[in-house]
Amino acid sequence: MSLLDTLQRGLADLDAQGLRRVRRIADTACDARMIVNRREIVGFASNDYLGLAAHPALVAAFAEGAQRYGAGSGGSHLLGGHSRAHARLEDELAGFAGGFSDAPRALYFSTGYMANLAAMTALAGKGATIFSDALNHASLIDGMRLSRANVQVYPHADTAALAALLDASEAETKLIVSDTVFSMDGDIAPLAELVALAERHGAWLVIDDAHGFGVLGPQGRGALAAAALRSPHLVYVGTLGKAAGVAGAFVIAHETVIEWLIQRARSYIFTTAAPPAVAHAVSASLKVIAGDEGDARRAHLAALIERTRALLRNTRWQPVDSHTAVQPLVIGSNDATLAAMRALDAHGLWVPAIRPPTVPAGTSRLRVSLSAAHSFDDLARLEAALIEASEAAAASVGAARQEAAA
């Protein structure tokens, strides 16, 4: 059998299971209201939590950065591609989100995936043990595999199980690794307990705050600031393409850790640096995030979250108890979840269906992703469509059961 035959059979299997992903094409800027596939929709799919992706100040800064530095960086960070915009942004990030450390330093990456690969592969290796939450992001998992460290997975957010694993470990280097806000459930890791366990067992704690940076904590400084946590043994990863509205990611840690990443992190060394204009736009984003406008956007987002929590309980499906901008609604089967997504699409609402392997089998769900750009009218429209779709689904299941019993 040829490779193409193998791939075609694999795609057919995905179709049979309702698991093939399809890209939609956006014709306008990321916003609450967009033109997607040539139709106007209200989008509940993006991670643009503060609604900054189309913010005029960020757009202007991006254009200004391109005029000043050009369209591309021209090389890797170690071979001519590290611009003043990159260096300034790293200093700003360390000052903004590095309050957990006495000597913080930041390192900018092109993507969150690359930042997590760097942290895992450069800080752990043969002889080290990584203790990983069962629901950690795929980029962390891939980094662990590449690191060649021993990986022990503990049940999601189960600090008692983690403590038992740490007690039994004789590894010289120990890393506890966890998302902060889990991207498919919206819950928040028990960070205070994780920090305490790390300090008690001489371990380092690496956290991925992709969905918390910009949203959680005073001025949006992130999950560690929200919990008022400090420790010299923390490595903090954040992304800049979600709440910050631009692109890229960063690692903040003690200056020695960052210097080691510069020297040894392959996903930092062996790739072209992101365009300086991107870093210039992120600097503008940080000003908005930290200012009064950022506070107002976070307050509006918090109100939207509470309203959404209430409206999801009015459906016949199972909402997940989340207090973040990620609001999942578990339906169960792939086919039923796809049918619900299509029903919402018919109302001009884009709410993505999340299916295995992203989530466990039998827990396919709609993932409502909120943005400060949404209005309460948008939520009212969403509620009406969800109730209609869930009632129709329940009626369909009831009819099928009656037919089977006949």
Curated annotation (Swiss-Prot):
Family: Belongs to the class-II pyridoxal-phosphate-dependent aminotransferase family. BioF subfamily.
PANTHER family for the chain: 8-AMINO-7-OXONONANOATE SYNTHASE, CLASS II AMINOTRANSFERASE/8-AMINO-7-OXONONANOATE SYNTHASE
Known partners and oligomeric status: Homodimer.
HAMAP family: BioF_aminotrans_2
Protein name, as recorded: 8-amino-7-oxononanoate synthase
Keyword vocabulary terms for this entry: Biotin biosynthesis, Pyridoxal phosphate, Transferase
NCBIfam families: bioF
Residue sites binding pyridoxal 5'-phosphate per the record: G112, Y113, S183, H211, T239
Highest taxon above the source species: Bacteria
EC number, UniProt record: 2.3.1.47
KW Transferase (keyword) present: yes
A GO molecular-function descriptor: pyridoxal phosphate binding
Cofactor: pyridoxal 5'-phosphate
InterPro entries per the UniProt record, alphabetical: Aminotransferase_I/II_large (IPR004839), AON_synthase_class-II (IPR050087), AONS_Archaea/Proteobacteria (IPR004723), AONS_Proteobacteria (IPR022834), PyrdxlP-dep_Trfase (IPR015424), PyrdxlP-dep_Trfase_major (IPR015421), PyrdxlP-dep_Trfase_small (IPR015422)
Purpose of the protein: Catalyzes the decarboxylative condensation of pimeloyl-[acyl-carrier protein] and L-alanine to produce 8-amino-7-oxononanoate (AON), [acyl-carrier protein], and carbon dioxide.
First and last residue of the signal peptide: none
Residues bearing PTM N6-(pyridoxal phosphate)lysine: K242
Top-level EC class as recorded in UniProt: transferase
Pathway(s) this gene product operates in, as recorded in its UniProt entry: Cofactor biosynthesis; biotin biosynthesis
GO biological process: biotin biosynthetic process
Catalytic reaction equation(s): 6-carboxyhexanoyl-[ACP] + L-alanine + H(+) = (8S)-8-amino-7-oxononanoate + holo-[ACP] + CO2
Organism of provenance: Burkholderia cenocepacia (strain HI2424)
Protein's gene: bioF
Binding-site residues, substrate: R21, H137, T358
